[in-house]
Design a protein with these regions (language model features):
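Bacterial N-terminal signal peptides that target proteins for export
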Residues: 1-8
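Bacterial N-terminal signal peptides
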Residues: 8-17
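A beta-rich soluble binding module of mature secreted/lumenal proteins
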Residues: 19-174
Length: 174
């Protein structure tokens, strides 16, 4: 998928209406930052050609600001693409809600953005369930790109219990 298509799809997601759902009660931002690997997600058109996604979540000065770098390997040709965004915490009580805005020339002045919520996470922050506020898309982020199938199944059960769509699962790890 071309970068322009990815950015256009990301911008379109920003226009979708948000519905209120519960998210994780508290997120310790010091433990949440760092490198994550996307190991499972539901099918979405924005990422249809993406595998082995890696997310770097890096603090940027203020306590509620982050730089995001999503590295994706395209399935079709193995080409690596990096999408960069800035994130800010939008709920400082729970620290579980973020607004991601694309950076660079095609950021549309910061208008191309999307809300993401942390719906669940391991006590030791070894994994997290991220999703859109309306639950139409979700991702399992893990610290270990080679998480066992048994652990994946346990986390997927939690995703199912949270009410996310489970129709078309995509295993995105190695």
């Amino acid at each position: 998928m071309s970068r322009a298509c990815l950015i256009a799809a990301f911008a379109a997601l920003a226009l979708m209406p948000a519905t209120s759902f519960a998210q994780a009660s508290d997120v310790d931002l010091d433990r949440f930052d760092g490198r994550w690997f996307e190991i499972e997600r539901n099918h979405n058109t924005v990422q249809k050609d993406c595998s082995r996604a890696q997310i770097d979540f890096t603090p940027q000065g203020a306590a509620d600001r982050y730089a995001i770098a999503v590295t994706c390997t395209r399935r079709a040709d193995g080409k690596v693409e990096v999408l960069r965004a800035n994130a800010r915490v939008t709920d400082t009580t729970s620290n579980a809600r973020f607004r991601f805005s694309l950076t660079g020339l095609l950021s549309f002045g910061g208008l191309a953005g999307q809300n993401y919520w942390v719906y669940d996470h391991a006590p030791d922050y070894s994994w997290a369930v991220m999703g859109l506020p309306d639950k139409s898309n979700w991702w399992i982020w893990h610290r270990d790109q080679n998480a066992s199938q048994a652990e994946r199944d346990r986390i997927l059960a939690r995703v199912r219990a949270l009410g996310f769509p489970m129709g078309r699962l995509v295993h995105t790890g190695l």
